[in-house]
Amino acid sequence: LIIGGGTSGAAVAWSLASAGMDVLCLEQGSWIDPWTYPTDQDDWELHYNTDYSPDPNVRKLPVDYPVNDEDSPISPLMYNAVGGSTIHWSAHFPRFHPSDFRVRSLDGVADDWPITYHELEPFFDMNDRIMGVAGIAGDPAYPKKADRQTPPIPLGKTGQVMARGFDKLGWHWWPADSAINTVE
């Protein structure tokens, strides 16, 4: 039994089912109709700050519960529905950098992770294959990663204008990895 089939729950469910185990995932909330998500509506900012807020204390939908964050410097980013908080990240799927695991050593903040990027790298690659991450391998701003199964999401008009501007200025840009199957 797995409570929550978002990114982590789905990965655990896949690994257990692959080993021959029967798996049941339970969700708090229902399916979200992608056509009702307000990103392409004129009043999207209103929805993002009310019924689609990442903070359940603001959202207050029937499936939500309050989270006491008064002693925390951060507010929760969570969503109670099938897919969990992945609903908020729009399938944008960047990887950590090796330096993200050493923030105490490099920047003097927080704590270093007890593991390194390179120890996790094979699991990053396996997860990318399971999820079907679309993109192009070879971005020099990131460590080497496995080839992507499908091509990146095509650039829209705004992205094309930005890419031309970046090229003109000699700035680096790269199509983002996305957890979306771009090939039927």
Residue spans of the language-model regions?
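N-terminal glycine-rich phosphate/pyrophosphate-binding loop and immediately adjacent elements
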Residues: 1-105, 109, 114-118, 122-125
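Conserved redox-cofactor binding core of oxidoreductases
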Residues: 49, 65, 92-95, 104-184
